[in-house]
Amino acid sequence: MAMEYFKGKVKENIELVEGIYSLVVEHEAKINAGQFYMIKTPNTFLGRPISVCEVNGNDVRFVYATVGAGTNEMKKMISGDEIEIIGPLGNGFDINKDYGRVALVSGGIGTAPMLELAKSLRKNNKDIKMDFYGGFRDDIYLVDEIAEYVDEVKISTNTGKHGHKGFVTEILPLQEYDTVLCCGPEIMMKKVVEMCKEAKVNVYISMEKHMACGVGACLVCICKTKSGNKRTCKDGPVFNGLEVEF
């Protein structure tokens, strides 16, 4: 689907756990899992890049963390409000690629795009071997929904409230997989890439960067790779992890 600018009507905006919200906007969209939209609230000058959590019929769902002025204004929006949106943007994950045995690995709000990714991969190949590994600080979210599409779910939390107490990288048996698809904090993805390189496992990561335009013009979101600087919003956000220079 080509990028477009539109004013979407908010259908639902609810808090899933403390500081994490689920925003549903009425909009018919065809996206690649891992793509994102720039979402602008009325009192902010620039939009915020928010990845697509899932597409259901004529609704697009975004799951976001409240971390600044834009997202803190976003959380106050109610059903019927209009919100300015540009997208879909970026490349997303290639769901037609033969990944073999796949591990979906996320950290924190990087869990958001994993739902649409799991749905798309399962729809494209019902026999795919696919497990989900999610790392959270304390409370967990989207896990039950993702579990509907994967074979196995394993969770870690920093506090030990759910699953393994520690980091998600500590519960990831790379020897069981051919490919890792990952999204989360850069420090976590760097560790995952290092582990995959050592284990000779393919890894694709969705980078999270500050963005101003979302269309490749401002060069705020540069990602360093072995083949030169890339624009996260235009050339990414999904990159071959083994090519990224952290």
Curated annotation (Swiss-Prot):
One of its GO terms (molecular function) is oxidoreductase activity. The keyword Iron-sulfur applies. Keywords: 2Fe-2S, Electron transport, FAD, Flavoprotein, Iron, Iron-sulfur, Metal-binding, Pyrimidine biosynthesis, Transport. It holds the Pfam family NAD_binding_1. Its cofactor is [2Fe-2S] cluster; FAD. It comes from the Bacteria. HAMAP family: DHODB_Fe_S_bind. FAD binds at residues 48-51, 70-71. InterPro entries: Cyt_c3_hydrogenase_gsu, Dihydroorotate_DH_ele_sf, Dihydroorotate_DH_Fe-S-bd, Dihydroorotate_DHASE_ETsu, FAD-bd_FR_type, FNR_nucleotide-bd, OxRdtase_FAD/NAD-bd, PyrK_electron_transfer. Heterotetramer of 2 PyrK and 2 PyrD type B subunits. Responsible for channeling the electrons from the oxidation of dihydroorotate from the FMN redox center in the PyrD type B subunit to the ultimate electron acceptor NAD(+). Belongs to the PyrK family. Transmembrane segments: none annotated. The keyword Chaperone does not apply. This is Dihydroorotate dehydrogenase B (NAD(+)), electron transfer subunit. GO terms for biological process: 'de novo' UMP biosynthetic process.
